[in-house]
Amino acid sequence: MSAELFENWLLKRARAEHSHIVLPEGDDDRILMAAHQLLDQDICDITILGDPVKIKERATELGLHLNTAYLVNPLTDPRLEEFAEQFAELRKSKSVTIDEAREIMKDISYFGTMMVHNGDADGMVSGAANTTAHTIKPSFQIIKTVPEASVVSSIFLMVLRGRLWAFGDCAVNPNPTAEQLGEIAVVSAKTAAQFGIDPRVAILSYSTGNSGGGSDVDRAIDALAEARRLNPELCVDGPLQFDAAVDPGVARKKMPDSDVAGQANVFIFPDLEAGNIGYKTAQRTGHALAVGPILQGLNKPVNDLSRGATVPDIVNTVAITAIQAGGRS
């Protein structure tokens, strides 16, 4: 599958779901341009947060048509008080007062997340102008995780040389435990399946099978056991070096009896450092299309953008979020 075909497939899937996505960063031109494209192609309904007058003026300057977008100013929206009351209740164990909650709800990330929590939007995409922490912290506090997830994690969908792969976790967890890695493997496989991947999961390491030793290898072995405990039907193996995971010739030599080695398509990196380096190496030197990070484990979809995101990146991430939202309804 080429990058172009995959992007077209994403948009077609998202259009079929026709979800409602909130974009909090209405003062960013890239967000407005992406919204224009999404609305023009009837991919999803869009709410943009910010000053409606300024958004309309900037859209006119850029030659954009946002007539069908919902433009919402959190500072004057009548839901602000209701959202503040809900947030104060959600965070009462942290002694958040109603006055503090009112101030917090003026923040675009919190207001957008509360819209998703209340069903006023099906998902949120942010991060073009804000940090990852600013984007996803509200979701931890408001939307929270599904019962079967102890952590929020992420995958990137990677289109490389005609192959569709998933890399996880490349954006959220710095140093996951063996148990968390096993859970991330299971959840990543489930997310990958939403996007047409028949998951064969490789838990990556610097060692393949029992060829090496050390605490990191032991962690990969324990992660494999946890993944199999959580989902006995999952096609997963490890520890695997990357070449053994993807190259059938290497796999025959190093792991000849593995159902995953040589044909893996979901790759679980040992930590955030390795995962982030891995996906960016594939993106920058292998010219892979990287779509994500796609957050997983939350009750409702919220996805983060890189501050270097292009307009096509934003369009793809909104499409991903729309598909995630549709899959839950």
UniProtKB/Swiss-Prot annotation:
It comes from the Bacteria. It is found in: Cytoplasm. GO terms for molecular function: phosphate acetyltransferase activity. Its EC number is 2.3.1.8. It is an enzyme of class 2 (transferase). Pfam families: PTA_PTB (PF01515). Pathway: Metabolic intermediate biosynthesis; acetyl-CoA biosynthesis; acetyl-CoA from acetate: step 2/2. Induction: Activated by RamA and repressed by RipA and RamB. InterPro entries: P_Ac_Bu_trans (IPR012147), P_AcTrfase (IPR004614), P_AcTrfase_dom1 (IPR042113), P_AcTrfase_dom2 (IPR042112), Phos_Acetyltrans/Butyryltrans (IPR050500), PTA_PTB (IPR002505). Gene3D superfamilies: 3.40.50.10950, Isocitrate/Isopropylmalate dehydrogenase-like. Keywords: Acyltransferase, Cytoplasm, Transferase. The keyword Acyltransferase applies. Belongs to the phosphate acetyltransferase and butyryltransferase family. This is Phosphate acetyltransferase. The lineage of its organism: Bacteria, Bacillati, Actinomycetota, Actinomycetes, Mycobacteriales.
